[in-house]
């Protein structure tokens, strides 16, 4: 292979890595809403698997006041976020031995 050809391949690889990093950031910042029970419960989650908001229709829990419902929504979001962080930490710990020595791009996690 000619010297110029190798330089071109390296440049393409760098451009692809930059595009992948940009796409990973866009995906991480994306927000989706999941709904259940005919929209009586909804959850807004980011691409980083962070629960941003939980909404529970008051009719699901009759007799529960608005303040208690808001606290329940916040506690549910916090519990799910805690579980997600624990799964991520466990995955990184388990995969650490497999990926030891590999030069992964910043922010790239295994498994994908």
UniProtKB/Swiss-Prot annotation:
GO terms for cellular component: bacterial nucleoid; cytosol. The keyword ATP-binding does not apply. Its main location: cytoplasm. Keywords: Cytoplasm, DNA-binding. InterPro entries: YbaB-like_sf (IPR036894), YbaB/EbfC (IPR004401). It is found in: Cytoplasm, Nucleoid. GO terms for molecular function: DNA binding. Binds to DNA and alters its conformation. May be involved in regulation of gene expression, nucleoid organization and DNA protection. Homodimer. This is Nucleoid-associated protein PFLU_4577. It comes from Pseudomonas fluorescens (strain SBW25).
